[in-house]
Regions:
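Short loop/turn microsegments at loop-to-beta-strand junctions
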Residues: 35-36, 58, 135-137
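N-terminal "domain-start" segment that seeds a small globular fold
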Residues: 21-50
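Short active-site neighborhood of thiol/selenol oxidoreductases, capturing the structured segment around
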Residues: 49-71
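Structural microenvironment flanking redox-active thiols in thiol-disulfide oxidoreductases
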Residues: 71-112, 125-128
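Positively charged n-region of N-terminal signal peptides that target proteins for export
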Residues: 1-4
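Bacterial N-terminal signal peptides
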Residues: 7-16
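Short, internal strand/loop/helix patches
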Residues: 94, 109-143
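Thiol-/selenol-based redox modules, centered on thioredoxin-like
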Residues: 140-171
Length: 171
């Protein structure tokens, strides 16, 4: 009987821990929420301020250089998303390197040769506005500044949904 209660006790805490982990991973920004106030400094690409994003469709893509799924997503951004929208004045792409400095991102991009801007977030200040853990993450905000789409992880199907959401936002 003692073993039963010990197992039951352990099972309860494993379940509770799993629920808490899922809650900790939940998006801080929900569909329909306003875009958090983002400021990014970059010598290479210029600074981003909340004022510079007003009235634009804004995609915030959060990644790390060591993350495999992030690499897949960024390769798709380079291949299909960036060529389609880079010249659209109503669209802004913010690819933000979680825990990376501008120097680290510059070195990383020398290898990857991405043509889109990479913004540093060494202290997770921007990342922490959106989530506590898990990358890649994508957040798309409409011209009104409201969240219209979000995803965690990478799949081709989710990326197609993101592209559709961008297209709809720019109409």
């Amino acid at each position: 009987m003692k073993k039963f209660f010990a197992l039951l006790f352990c099972g309860f805490f494993l379940f509770a821990g799993n629920v808490l982990a899922q809650e900790a991973d939940a998006d801080k920004v929900k569909l329909g929420d306003d875009m958090p106030s983002i400021t990014l400094k970059s010598e290479s690409y210029g600074d981003v301020t909340p004022e510079s994003l007003k009235g634009k469709v804004v995609l915030v893509s959060l990644f790390a250089t060591w993350c495999g799924p992030c690499q897949l997503e960024l390769a798709e951004v380079q291949k299909s998303l960036w060529p389609a929208y880079k010249d659209n004045p109503d669209f802004k792409l913010l690819v933000v390197g979680r825990e990376h400095t501008e120097a680290e991102l510059k070195k990383y991009n020398e290898r990857k040769k991405f043509s889109f801007p990479l913004y540093a977030d060494p202290g997770r200040k921007v990342y922490s506005l959106f989530a506590d853990q898990t990358i890649p993450r994508a957040y798309l905000f409409g011209k009104d500044g409201k969240l219209v789409y979000s995803s965690v992880g990478y799949s081709k199907d989710e990326f197609r949904k993101l592209m559709d959401a961008i297209e709809n936002g720019l109409k």
